[in-house]
Amino acid sequence: QRHRTAKWGGTYDPSKKDKKALLNKVLEYAPKKPLEGALQMILVFYMPRPKSHYRSGKYSHLLKDSSPTNHIKTPDSDNLGKLVMDALDKKFYKNDSQICQLQIEKLYCDIGERPSTEVHIEHI
């Protein structure tokens, strides 16, 4: 999310806590020095499945045949991507303007998987 204006006239970043939480989880993978040059970033977001994707009764642990693989609801891909790019800025690369190629996928988790995010960054 973008910065918001409060009733008292100041601005705040509603996603600041999310960015900090993400950075804390991935900091151990950060390079010793931020990457330089043109970069490619691939992001894969595994989203939780709603109960409506599952069968009922004794087969409630199985997915319906009609269950989609791709997540087409909010949050939007561009907002998720911006959150990750902003969170990793200055630690993984000098500036997110270095990201020349960006691929974002939003998929539903498979049975037994937890929601997660994969981040791949490489030089191009």
For the regions a language model picked out, list residue spans one by one.
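Acidic, proline/glycine-enriched N-terminal capping motif
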Residues: 1-124
